């Protein structure tokens, strides 16, 4: 049965209240009753629309990283484009789904799994399209995700002063250098990235 305008508004109010609670308190401390009170509705309505706290959380943290299309981007511009994209995205998402997910992932395994899935399904796929398939490519994708999540955690959750004080411009410049090395630099590990018996090389060799 299609939702009416009234029910759609109620769902959105519940979702907005849930995001605010998850941002402020994290997953474990947030209750359906609190969300219902904040949304000016009854807990039964929250359950009717979303089914459970887990499903409400999943709806609140549905994330699309909106990754740029790198198909025709010159090799020497890829790192800068990605750095600018992620620095801007984290800034604009300060109280949004991605920040909620990152904050909750520290203490809640389901949130951690959802965050892993976001980066595996989006960042890893992007890096594979850029560099080809192989163990080394997946390692580079993992290192890229590690750096991007670490910067976000330090700047927007922990608010470590040296990182939090950086201007967006300076952070983009620093991140560009790191991302460039992660994607194209040598990796001092004893593992060859092979696909079909042939070693894969990075996009820029």
Which residues does each PLM region occupy?
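Hydrophobic alpha-helical connector segments
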Residues: 66-102
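Amphipathic alpha-helical segments used for helix-helix packing
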Residues: 61, 90-121
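Hydrophobic/aromatic-rich alpha-helical bundle segments in the mid-to-C-terminal region
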Residues: 112-116, 130-182, 186-195
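Short alpha-helical scaffolding segments that buttress acidic/His motifs in well-ordered protein cores
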Residues: 86, 98-105, 144-148, 152
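Alpha-helical DNA-contacting segments of helix-turn-helix folds
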Residues: 57-64, 71
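Basic, helix-initiating cap at the start of DNA-binding domains
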Residues: 1-44, 54-55, 198-204
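Residues in the recognition helix of alpha-helical DNA-binding motifs
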Residues: 49
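An amphipathic alpha-helix signature
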Residues: 15, 80-84, 120, 124, ...
């Amino acid at each position: 049965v299609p939702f009416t305008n009234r029910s759609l508004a109620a769902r959105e109010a519940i979702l907005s209240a849930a995001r605010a609670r998850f941002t402020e308190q994290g997953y474990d401390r947030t209750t359906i009753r609190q969300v219902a009170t904040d949304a000016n509705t009854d807990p039964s309505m929250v359950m009717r629309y979303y089914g459970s706290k887990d499903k409400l959380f999943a709806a609140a943290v549905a994330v699309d990283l909106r990754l740029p299309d790198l198909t025709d981007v010159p090799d020497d511009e890829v790192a800068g484009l990605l750095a600018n994209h992620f620095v801007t995205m984290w800034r604009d998402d300060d109280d949004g789904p991605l920040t909620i997910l990152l904050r909750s992932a520290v203490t809640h395994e389901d949130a951690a799994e959802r965050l892993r899935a976001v980066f595996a399904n989006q960042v890893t796929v992007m890096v594979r399209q850029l560099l080809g398939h192989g163990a080394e490519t997946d390692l580079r994708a993992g290192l890229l995700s590690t750096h991007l999540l670490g910067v976000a955690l330090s700047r927007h959750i922990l608010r470590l002063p040296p990182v939090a004080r950086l201007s967006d411009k300076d952070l983009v410049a620093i991140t560009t250098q790191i991302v460039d090395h992660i994607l194209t630099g040598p990796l001092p590990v004893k593992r060859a990235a092979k696909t079909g018996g042939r070693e894969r090389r990075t996009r820029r060799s």
